[in-house]
Amino acid sequence: MPKFMDVHHGMHGVTPEALQAAHQADLDIQGEEGVDFQRAWGDPESGMVWCISEAPSKEAVQRIHERAGHPATEVYPVPVEV
């Protein structure tokens, strides 16, 4: 299944607990779109959050994030991994 990296902006001051809660909201509904969110990272200072997932499409990734309450600003395919 294709991999995707998505980026969220505007999450200034994000804490580990807030990031875990947002990630869990994705995990709770990811199966409805066939998405597998694997990991999330955050930078409280810049307000950026990044997520890596496997999904049938970038649109599926975006739909889950939107439904979970934190739409991604950008979603990129990750065609090469080492």
What are these regions (language model features)?
Residues 70-82:
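Conserved short beta-strand edge segments in small beta-sheet-based binding/regulatory domains
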